[in-house]
A protein has these predicted regions:
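Rieske [2Fe-2S] iron-sulfur-binding domain
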Residues: 16-103
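Zn-dependent metallo-beta-lactamase
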Residues: 1-22
Length: 103
C-alpha cells in the first residue's frame, strides 16, 4: 500500500493527538514525548467517540466520553469500558511530513 501524506510534523504538539480524516474514515495521529508518531483508528471502540478529543498522557489516550483507555503505540485496550483494541497503522516521517500506510 502507498504511504499517504497526513500532515506536517509540527501540526501535532508533543504528547498530543489530532484528528485526520482520509476518504470516508477517521484516524487519530499522535506524537509522543520522544517525538515518535503513531496512528490509530480515530473512533473509540466502545461508543464511536472521536479520540482526538481525548486526553493523551504517557503513550495512552483516554476516551473523552467514558474514560476508557488505550495504549496508542499498539492499540491495546487498557481500561473499561473499552475491551476491543484499536487498529494501528504504520507511520514514518519524511521531509517534515507525517506519512501513514493504510490498508
Amino acid at each position: 500500500m502507498p504511504w499517504i501524506d497526513a500532515c506536517a510534523i509540527d501540526d501535532i504538539e508533543e504528547e498530543d493527538v489530532i484528528r485526520w480524516d482520509h476518504g470516508d474514515r477517521t484516524f487519530a495521529l499522535y506524537r509522543s514525548l520522544d517525538n515518535a508518531y503513531y496512528c490509530t483508528d480515530g473512533l473509540c471502540t466502545h461508543e464511536q467517540v472521536h479520540l482526538s478529543d481525548g486526553l493523551v498522557m504517557d503513550n495512552e489516550i483516554e476516551c473523552p466520553k467514558h474514560n476508557g483507555l488505550f495504549d496508542y503505540t499498539n492499540g491495546k485496550a487498557l481500561r473499561a469500558p473499552v475491551c476491543e483494541d484499536l487498529k494501528t497503522y504504520p507511520v514514518k516521517t519524511e521531509a517534515g511530513r507525517v506519512l501513514v500506510e493504510l490498508d
